[in-house]
Amino acid sequence: PIPDAATLQRFLGPPLAESFMRYCGMTEQEAARATDDYRERYNPVGWKENQVYPHIRALLAALKKRGAYLAVATGKPQQSAETILRYFGLTPYLDAVAGPREQDLHADKGALIRRVLPENARAVMIGDTPGDIQGAQDCGIDSVAALYGYGEKAELLAAGPTHAAEDTAALCALLCPDMEKQKGFFVTLEGVDGCGKST
């Protein structure tokens, strides 16, 4: 049976196979098969249905102009993440991208962050799932809970983020307070994980 909407919402963020096992009671083999079935549609066309939240492109540009090192640590397979970022024109802002290999069923967010985090860097992880916040904590860095993303607000706040942003305007104010406010800015694309985490 197809899970209800609340359960499907929980699929956003963690690796897909992990969600199939956790929320649908599948075995690892069944979850791998279900993930393959999902990718039959997602790989050719589904990924193009992403969107970048308002203000994210301007925020990336402003941070880059200030010399910030910008990276993505995502639960999406690395190749898919790179394709999405390139398609939506976000690659020029980024210094690094880390995601699990296509065949990996589990992704440790802390390990993914460490892959893109320069040694002794002062950094912040922006994420919309408790796993993102936990990954930041595992790496000893600050975090911003993107409350406008796909994660459950209560769960996200319970994870103990350093900061929280209700919307992308609040995220801009937090990360780049002197950034010019955007009026009538584009409404097109989405951050790779649904919340502009590409910052």
Cite the ranges covered by each PLM segment.
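Structured catalytic core of nucleotide-sugar glycosyltransferases
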Residues: 7-8, 58, 97, 126
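Glycine-rich phosphate-binding loop of ATP-dependent small-molecule kinases
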Residues: 177-199
